[in-house]
């Protein structure tokens, strides 16, 4: 897939924000506007007409226009649920938090197959699952449309706003791929799962995995198609993840008399210097492993804090670290990190490592459907959070595919083109058909 035009990606024309709880991010004043001098033939009305004429683009617009930052997904979930119910789907809203019913996953399947959702006969339910997430990262950025003044091709219209790419583009394309498939193959055993909380640890997908009703044993699904921005390529796998905090504890004192205290920052620095280079150190020398498929393991010290003032010996210091694992297990990586910190500090018990999340190793995925480019990615997904039970007939096929590029997914230039969204529908239909063919062969 060709990269998006850098000019188009930097555009952010003013658009009125819908009345949602989070404050929208204002367009940056110094970002150039597209075709200001010659844009009269491409009025906002003409751009809106293109979207209004397409059920796919209209649904995507309406979904993106609803703020759904992680923790506040209720309105977006209700919109998706209502849409699916109006298109003859049975919709189950699975609560994710016990405090309220405002956060829920959406599990849906054709009403004509409702009788088959039976725990005692899981093989009779939906067998092909399309799944993505409806939450986004902050801040909310309003939906907007942009077009180069010299481009008359509607397919090149740029659709911008928070979630256009990650991952409401996948949600929209998956829904319309399912609708198109069911229109010509009504018995197709399709299920749709749209979860909350993917951006903040995956509590939505974990809740689905733990449901014996929705996720019975043995698994009813023989194929799962995950939706994330992959530039319309099939992903052969993505790196694993390990998150942790390095913390040091000291004793405060006046900076004029530092020997009366113990500097937590001085204690933590050798540990961080060692951790920062673990991805570049050979395994036999105590480093983190690499692989031919995923390259090097990467380490990012993304947060640091410590001390209260420059003239006070700091009593506390801490740093947050994210590791993208190219090989091995997260348990093995933990041991490597712990040993590195011990070696760097000489076993100083004032410096400790706290592992915040469970973590996971590299995730290998299927790419056995012809007609797609194949790639690997470095970002994390809900793939490891979906824990399916074994099937008597073998392993579950897992695919990762979707429109847009991760390079803009969390930025203020998040956007994709009409062509990418429409092509994603065709791509998902191809993956669905391959799964249907497999189940009947």
From Swiss-Prot:
Write out the residues that bind Zn(2+) 2.
166
Q: What EC class is this?
A: hydrolase
Q: Where in the cell is it found?
A: Secreted
Q: What's a Gene Ontology MF term here?
A: metal ion binding
Q: What is its EC number?
A: 3.4.17.-
User: What are the GO BP annotations of this UniProt entry?
Assistant: proteolysis
Q: Keywords for this entry?
A: Glycoprotein, Hydrolase, Metal-binding, Protease, Secreted, Signal, Zinc
In this record, what's one Pfam family? M20_dimer
Gene Ontology cellular-component terms listed: extracellular region
State its cofactor. Answer: Zn(2+)
Q: Which residues form the signal peptide?
A: 1-16
- Entry-linked PROSITE patterns: ARGE_DAPE_CPG2_1, ARGE_DAPE_CPG2_2
Matches recorded under InterPro entries: ArgE/DapE_CS, Bact_exopeptidase_dim_dom, Peptidase_M20, Peptidase_M20_dimer, Peptidase_M20A, Peptidase_M20C
Residues annotated as the enzyme's active site? 198 (proton acceptor)
- The answer to whether UniProt assigns keyword Secreted to this entry is yes
Which protein family is named in the record? Belongs to the peptidase M20A family.
Which protein are we looking at?
Answer: Probable carboxypeptidase NFIA_052450
């Amino acid at each position: 897939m060709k990269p998006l035009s850098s000019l188009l990606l930097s555009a952010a024309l003013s658009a009125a924000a819908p009345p949602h709880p989070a404050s929208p991010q204002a367009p940056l004043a110094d970002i150039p506007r597209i075709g200001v001098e010659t844009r009269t033939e491409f009025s906002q009305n003409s751009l809106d007409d293109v979207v209004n004429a397409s059920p796919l683009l209209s649904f995507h617009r309406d979904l993106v226009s609803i703020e759904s930052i992680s923790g506040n997904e209720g309105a977006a979930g209700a919109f998706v649920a209502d849409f699916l119910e109006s298109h003859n789907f049975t919709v189950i809203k699975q609560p994710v938090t016990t405090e309220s019913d405002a956060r829920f996953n959406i599990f849906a399947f054709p009403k004509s197959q409702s009788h088959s959702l039976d725990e005692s006969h899981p093989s009779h339910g939906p067998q092909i699952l399309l799944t993505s997430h409806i939450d986004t990262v902050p801040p909310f950025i309003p939906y907007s449309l942009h077009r180069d003044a010299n481009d008359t091709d509607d397919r090149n219209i740029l659709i911008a706003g928070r979630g256009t790419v990650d991952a409401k583009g996948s949600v929209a394309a998956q829904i319309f791929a399912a609708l198109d498939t069911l229109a010509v193959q009504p018995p197709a055993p399709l299920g749709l799962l749209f979860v909350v909380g993917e951006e903040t640890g995956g509590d939505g997908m974990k809740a689905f995995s733990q449901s014996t009703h929705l996720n019975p044993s043995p698994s009813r699904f023989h194929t799962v198609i995950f939706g994330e921005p992959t530039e319309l390529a099939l992903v052969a796998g993505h790196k694993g993840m390990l998150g942790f905090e390095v913390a040091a504890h000291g004793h405060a004192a006046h900076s004029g008399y530092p020997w009366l205290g113990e500097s937590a920052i001085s204690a933590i620095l050798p540990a961080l210097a060692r951790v920062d280079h673990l991805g570049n150190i050979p395994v036999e020398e105590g480093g983190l492993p690499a692989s031919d498929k995923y390259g090097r393991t990467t380490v990012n010290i993304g947060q640091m804090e410590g001390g209260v003032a420059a003239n006070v010996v700091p009593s506390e210091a801490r740093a947050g670290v994210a590791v993208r694992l190219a090989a091995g297990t997260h348990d093995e990586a933990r041991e490597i990190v712990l040993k590195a910190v011990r070696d760097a500090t000489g076993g100083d018990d004032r410096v400790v490592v706290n592992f915040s999340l469970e973590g996971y190793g590299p995730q290998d995925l299927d790419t056995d459907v012809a007609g797609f480019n194949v790639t690997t990615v470095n970002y994390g997904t809900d793939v490891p959070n979906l824990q399916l039970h074994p099937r008597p007939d073998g392993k579950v096929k897992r695919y990762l595919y979707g429109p847009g590029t991760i390079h803009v997914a969390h930025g203020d230039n998040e956007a994709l083109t009409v062509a990418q969204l429409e092509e994603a529908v065709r791509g998902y239909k191809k993956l669905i058909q391959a799964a249907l063919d497999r189940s009947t062969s």
